[in-house]
Amino acid sequence: MTELNRVVAHFTDGKLLKGTTQDFFPNRPRFHLQPAAGGAPVEVRCRSLKALFFVKEFVGNASRRDLRGFLNSPGETAQGKKIAVRFKDGELLCGYSLSYLPDREGFFMFPSDSGSNNLRIYVIAAATVEVKAGPSADVLAQKVLATRPE
C-alpha cells in the first residue's frame, strides 16, 4: 500500500495547493494531488513548482514564528549537510540535505527548525537563484538574513 503524503505545492506563480499525494517521485515529471478542499485530483507538473512541502498538518500554528537561519545547528546531521536555498521570489530556506547535487532537477531537504510544520521539502532547482551546501550555507543564510528585518 502506498503512503498517503500531506503536501503543500508552492507554484512559481505564487499559487498554493494543499492536498495529499500517493504518486510523487522526484524522477517523474508529474504527479497527482487530491485537494484538501475536495474535488477531483489535479495533475501537477513539477516544472511549474517552486517546491513541494511535505507537512505534518494542513493548518499550521499562525502564532508560531519559524526560526531564522541555522542558529547553532551542527554542520552535519543524520539528515545530511547544511544547505541554504534562495528562491527567485526571494524566499530563503535553511536545512539539511543528503541528496543535493548541483546538476539535478531537484532535491529533498529537511528544515533546520525541528519545530517546523514541514517534514521535508522537495526543491525544484530551476526555481532557485542560489544554493549553498556545507559551511557556505551559513554564509548565504547570514548574508540574506542581514538584509531583512525580523
Give residue ranges: language-model regions.
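Conserved RNA-binding domains used in RNP assembly and mRNA/RNA metabolism
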Residues: 1-150
